[in-house]
Amino acid sequence: MVIEWGTALYQLLAFAVLLLILSKFALKPLLGVMQKRQDMINEQIDSAEQNRKEAEKLLAEQREEMQKARVEARELIENAKKAGEQQGQEMVRAAKEEAQRIHQQALAEIQNEKDQAVAALREQVASLSVLIAQKVIEKELDASEQDQLVQEYLKQASEEL
C-alpha cells in the first residue's frame, strides 16, 4: 500500500478547513444552544431547590401552628374543666349554705314553738294554780287529797295540750 502524500495532505487540509467552518458556523451556535439549555436546567434546579426550601419552611410553619393549636386546645379544655369544677364547688357551697340556712330557720321555728308552748303551759299552770288555790280554799284538804287533786289537774292540763 502506497500512501500518496499529496492526497493525504489535501484531505487533511480539507478536514481542517471543514473543522474551522464547522466550529465558526455550526459549533458556536450549537455550543450556545447547549449552554442556554444547561443554564435553563440550572435555573430549574435552583428554582426547584428554592421551592423545596420554601415548602420545608411552610411545612415547619404549619407544624408550629398545629402545635400552637394543640396547646391552645389543651389550655381551653383545662380552663373548661377548672371552670366546671369551680362551678360545681360553688353549687355545692351554695347548697350547703342553703341547707344551713334552712336548718337554722327550722331551729329558730322550733325554739319559737317551744317558747310559745312554754308560755301557754305557764298560763295553764297559773290558771290551774288559781283553780287549785280556789278549791283548797273552798275545802280543807289533807296531803293525800291535795296530791290527788294536783294529779287530776295535771292530767287535765296534759289532755288540753
From Swiss-Prot:
UniProt cross-references to InterPro entries, sorted A to Z: ATP_synth_B-like_membr_sf, ATP_synth_b/b'su_bac/chlpt, ATP_synth_F0_bsu_bac, ATP_synthase_B_chain
Places the protein is found: Cell membrane
GO molecular function, one term: proton-transporting ATP synthase activity, rotational mechanism
UniProt membrane topology term: Single-pass membrane protein
Xref: Pfam families: ATP-synt_B (PF00430)
Domain of life: Bacteria
Segments traversing the membrane: 2-22
A GO CC term attached to the entry: proton-transporting ATP synthase complex
Protein family: Belongs to the ATPase B chain family.
Function: F(1)F(0) ATP synthase produces ATP from ADP in the presence of a proton or sodium gradient. F-type ATPases consist of two structural domains, F(1) containing the extramembraneous catalytic core and F(0) containing the membrane proton channel, linked together by a central stalk and a peripheral stalk. During catalysis, ATP synthesis in the catalytic domain of F(1) is coupled via a rotary mechanism of the central stalk subunits to proton translocation. Component of the F(0) channel, it forms part of the peripheral stalk, linking F(1) to F(0).
Subunit structure: F-type ATPases have 2 components, F(1) - the catalytic core - and F(0) - the membrane proton channel. F(1) has five subunits: alpha(3), beta(3), gamma(1), delta(1), epsilon(1). F(0) has three main subunits: a(1), b(2) and c(10-14). The alpha and beta chains form an alternating ring which encloses part of the gamma chain. F(1) is attached to F(0) by a central stalk formed by the gamma and epsilon chains, while a peripheral stalk is formed by the delta and b chains.
NCBIfam families per the UniProt record, alphabetical: ATP_synt_b
The protein's name: ATP synthase subunit b
Gene (name only): atpF
